Amino acid sequence: MCVICGVRPATTADHVPPRGFFKGTVGQFKTVPACSPCNNGSSADDESLRNYISAQVGKQTLGAKYLWEMGAHKSFLRSTKIRSALLSTLQEVEVLNANSSAITRLAFLVPVSLYQRVFERVTRGLHFLHTGKILPADIPVQINLLTDAPDLSSPEFQIFEKHSIAEDA
Protein backbone atom coordinates (compact mmCIF):
# COMPACT_ATOMS: atom_id res chain seq x y z
CA MET A 1 0.00 0.00 0.00
CA CYS A 2 1.27 3.50 -0.86
CA VAL A 3 2.12 5.31 2.38
CA ILE A 4 1.57 8.72 0.73
CA CYS A 5 -2.02 8.39 -0.52
CA GLY A 6 -2.99 5.25 1.41
CA VAL A 7 -5.19 4.20 -1.51
CA ARG A 8 -3.21 2.66 -4.37
CA PRO A 9 -0.82 -0.31 -4.25
CA ALA A 10 2.85 0.61 -3.79
CA THR A 11 4.83 -0.09 -6.94
CA THR A 12 7.87 2.15 -6.31
CA ALA A 13 9.99 3.50 -3.45
CA ASP A 14 9.95 7.25 -2.74
CA HIS A 15 12.88 9.04 -1.07
CA VAL A 16 11.78 10.77 2.12
CA PRO A 17 12.82 13.57 2.28
CA PRO A 18 13.50 14.09 -1.44
CA ARG A 19 17.05 13.11 -2.37
CA GLY A 20 17.48 16.30 -4.43
CA PHE A 21 17.42 18.33 -1.20
CA PHE A 22 20.79 16.84 -0.26
CA LYS A 23 23.07 17.34 -3.26
CA GLY A 24 26.51 15.88 -2.65
CA THR A 25 25.33 13.55 0.11
CA VAL A 26 26.34 9.95 -0.48
CA GLY A 27 24.81 6.72 0.69
CA GLN A 28 21.47 5.02 0.66
CA PHE A 29 18.63 7.42 1.45
CA LYS A 30 15.51 6.38 3.36
CA THR A 31 12.63 5.29 1.13
CA VAL A 32 8.99 4.41 1.68
CA PRO A 33 6.58 2.31 -0.39
CA ALA A 34 4.73 4.55 -2.85
CA CYS A 35 2.52 4.26 -5.90
CA SER A 36 3.79 5.61 -9.20
CA PRO A 37 1.50 8.70 -9.28
CA CYS A 38 2.57 9.79 -5.76
CA ASN A 39 6.28 9.16 -6.42
CA ASN A 40 6.91 10.03 -10.06
CA GLY A 41 4.27 12.74 -10.14
CA SER A 42 6.16 14.70 -7.49
CA SER A 43 9.60 15.09 -9.09
CA ALA A 44 8.90 18.54 -10.54
CA ASP A 45 7.50 19.72 -7.19
CA ASP A 46 10.59 18.43 -5.38
CA GLU A 47 12.90 20.27 -7.77
CA SER A 48 10.89 23.49 -7.59
CA LEU A 49 10.77 23.47 -3.80
CA ARG A 50 14.51 22.79 -3.61
CA ASN A 51 15.05 25.81 -5.85
CA TYR A 52 12.86 28.11 -3.75
CA ILE A 53 14.46 26.99 -0.48
CA SER A 54 17.93 27.37 -1.97
CA ALA A 55 17.09 30.85 -3.29
CA GLN A 56 15.84 31.83 0.19
CA VAL A 57 18.85 30.46 2.05
CA GLY A 58 21.53 31.43 -0.47
CA LYS A 59 25.09 30.38 0.26
CA GLN A 60 25.11 30.90 4.05
CA THR A 61 26.70 27.53 4.82
CA LEU A 62 28.89 25.09 2.93
CA GLY A 63 25.92 22.73 2.48
CA ALA A 64 23.66 25.56 1.29
CA LYS A 65 26.33 26.74 -1.14
CA TYR A 66 26.69 23.23 -2.56
CA LEU A 67 22.90 22.85 -2.86
CA TRP A 68 22.74 26.14 -4.77
CA GLU A 69 25.68 25.46 -7.07
CA MET A 70 24.97 21.78 -7.80
CA GLY A 71 21.18 21.95 -7.76
CA ALA A 72 19.11 25.11 -7.87
CA HIS A 73 21.50 27.27 -9.89
CA LYS A 74 21.78 24.57 -12.55
CA SER A 75 17.97 24.32 -12.68
CA PHE A 76 17.64 28.08 -13.16
CA LEU A 77 20.23 28.06 -15.95
CA ARG A 78 18.68 25.03 -17.69
CA SER A 79 14.99 25.92 -17.55
CA THR A 80 13.39 29.17 -18.69
CA LYS A 81 10.13 28.05 -17.07
CA ILE A 82 11.73 27.57 -13.64
CA ARG A 83 13.66 30.82 -13.91
CA SER A 84 10.59 32.79 -15.07
CA ALA A 85 8.40 31.42 -12.26
CA LEU A 86 10.75 32.91 -9.66
CA LEU A 87 11.67 36.11 -11.50
CA SER A 88 8.04 36.99 -12.30
CA THR A 89 7.39 37.56 -8.59
CA LEU A 90 10.67 39.32 -7.80
CA GLN A 91 10.24 42.76 -6.23
CA GLU A 92 12.13 45.26 -4.12
CA VAL A 93 11.08 45.50 -0.47
CA GLU A 94 12.28 47.60 2.42
CA VAL A 95 13.52 45.75 5.50
CA LEU A 96 15.25 46.82 8.68
CA ASN A 97 18.90 45.91 9.07
CA ALA A 98 20.67 45.15 12.38
CA ASN A 99 20.89 48.89 13.11
CA SER A 100 17.13 49.32 12.52
CA SER A 101 17.81 51.29 9.35
CA ALA A 102 15.60 50.68 6.33
CA ILE A 103 17.40 49.01 3.43
CA THR A 104 16.15 47.68 0.10
CA ARG A 105 16.34 43.98 -0.67
CA LEU A 106 14.95 41.70 -3.36
CA ALA A 107 12.12 39.36 -2.41
CA PHE A 108 9.97 36.83 -4.23
CA LEU A 109 6.63 35.24 -3.49
CA VAL A 110 6.79 31.80 -1.92
CA PRO A 111 4.31 29.35 -3.50
CA VAL A 112 2.65 28.04 -0.34
CA SER A 113 0.70 25.36 -2.25
CA LEU A 114 4.01 23.89 -3.49
CA TYR A 115 5.37 23.72 0.07
CA GLN A 116 2.07 22.12 1.18
CA ARG A 117 2.22 19.36 -1.45
CA VAL A 118 5.87 18.42 -0.87
CA PHE A 119 5.87 18.65 2.92
CA GLU A 120 2.61 16.74 3.22
CA ARG A 121 4.18 13.91 1.21
CA VAL A 122 7.35 14.07 3.34
CA THR A 123 5.34 14.15 6.58
CA ARG A 124 3.30 11.12 5.57
CA GLY A 125 6.49 9.29 4.57
CA LEU A 126 8.30 10.17 7.80
CA HIS A 127 5.28 9.15 9.85
CA PHE A 128 5.44 5.72 8.22
CA LEU A 129 9.21 5.45 8.76
CA HIS A 130 8.87 6.26 12.46
CA THR A 131 5.69 4.33 13.29
CA GLY A 132 5.38 1.66 10.61
CA LYS A 133 1.80 2.84 10.07
CA ILE A 134 0.17 4.75 7.23
CA LEU A 135 -1.19 8.13 8.30
CA PRO A 136 -4.86 7.98 7.22
CA ALA A 137 -5.77 10.22 4.29
CA ASP A 138 -8.50 11.88 6.37
CA ILE A 139 -5.87 13.16 8.83
CA PRO A 140 -4.90 16.59 7.50
CA VAL A 141 -1.31 17.77 7.26
CA GLN A 142 -1.14 21.57 7.41
CA ILE A 143 1.97 23.55 6.52
CA ASN A 144 2.54 26.93 8.17
CA LEU A 145 5.31 29.20 6.98
CA LEU A 146 7.61 30.47 9.71
CA THR A 147 8.51 34.13 10.05
CA ASP A 148 11.99 33.20 11.31
CA ALA A 149 14.09 30.13 11.99
CA PRO A 150 13.30 28.25 15.21
CA ASP A 151 16.01 27.61 17.78
CA LEU A 152 16.65 23.90 17.26
CA SER A 153 18.66 23.74 20.50
CA SER A 154 15.61 24.72 22.58
CA PRO A 155 14.10 22.11 24.95
CA GLU A 156 11.02 21.78 22.70
CA PHE A 157 13.19 20.42 19.88
CA GLN A 158 15.59 18.40 22.04
CA ILE A 159 12.86 15.88 22.89
CA PHE A 160 12.83 14.64 19.28
CA GLU A 161 14.92 11.63 18.32
CA LYS A 162 17.56 12.30 15.69
CA HIS A 163 17.84 9.97 12.70
CA SER A 164 20.20 9.92 9.76
CA ILE A 165 18.66 9.91 6.29
CA ALA A 166 21.92 8.86 4.59
CA GLU A 167 25.57 8.29 5.50
CA ASP A 168 26.46 11.96 5.94
CA ALA A 169 23.06 13.63 6.35
Spans of features found by a protein language model:
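Exposed alpha-helical structural elements
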Residues: 47-48, 81, 85, 114-117, ...
